[in-house]
UniProtKB/Swiss-Prot annotation:
Keywords, sorted A to Z: Glycosyltransferase, Transferase
Catalytic class of the enzyme: transferase
This enzyme's EC code(s): 2.4.-.-
Designated name of the protein: Uncharacterized glycosyltransferase MG060 homolog
Pfam families, alphabetized: Glycos_transf_2 (PF00535)
Amino acid sequence: MKISVIISTYNCGALIVKALCSLVSNQTPACELEVLVIDDGSIDNTRQIIKKFQAKVSFTLKYFYKKNGNWGSVINYVKENRLANGDWITVLDSDDTLKPNTLNKLANLVEKADYDLVVFDYTKCWKKIKLKIHTYPTWWKNMTRELQKQTPFCIPLGKFLKRNLFYKLPKLKEKVSFQDALYTASSLKLAKKVRHVNQSGGNYHFKRAGNSMSIPWNIKRFSAELDICKDLIRLNAQEIALVHLLRQQFRVQLKEKQIQLAVTRDFNFSGFSWYTRCFLWMVYQTMLKRYFYLQTTKQ
């Protein structure tokens, strides 16, 4: 089995070493590893670091340099040039790492059953705090219903797509942030068989300086967040759009601009774990309901 790992990077030469080392420790006879480093216009020493690693590792490590266009442009670049050749494809940000044995666990799973998408839990790291995030309820394994497949934890880390699913994904927007949420939501919508693994597949470094979560709240960020919410609603993932409104500054600007988001059905949190369901229902009823309105369709 061949696995393609896409590493999106921009001026992260000091951090990408850990990401690459985590792949070295994941090598297994069950998997042929192909690593594609897509440099989104860095001006640091990323190229030199990758060149040194290419001489040391036993797996395929390719480096591509492109003009800066943000995260969505990296995925588009890989798809347009058909760079990922693995049976399974995943995306790893340059400041994140895979947990040991993740690829071996994946290989054992997909050998026994036919899945379109395999979703691991992950560990959220912030300063010295580490918290395991359960992408789905711990006892859930196989998801087929559309609303059941939704998850508010929509970073690409630990999500492995079959190659044909990856290349079916819609083109992402470029030169804007937060396209990873749309990437994940589209993957979940198109996947017919989703397998959840109740095991952390990687470490996600939250609010690192320079990543999308550390971007200041200006008009550009507001517009990007608003567009993502509208796109998620179009994907029938309005519950995930609601999660974006947990950010206070986003709500403040929506209120100032008197913007409400149109949805075409009532909110349904039944696909989430009981604690996530209770929390989202409560904040929707008490805080967020005012930011949405039900758009009736004409007969």
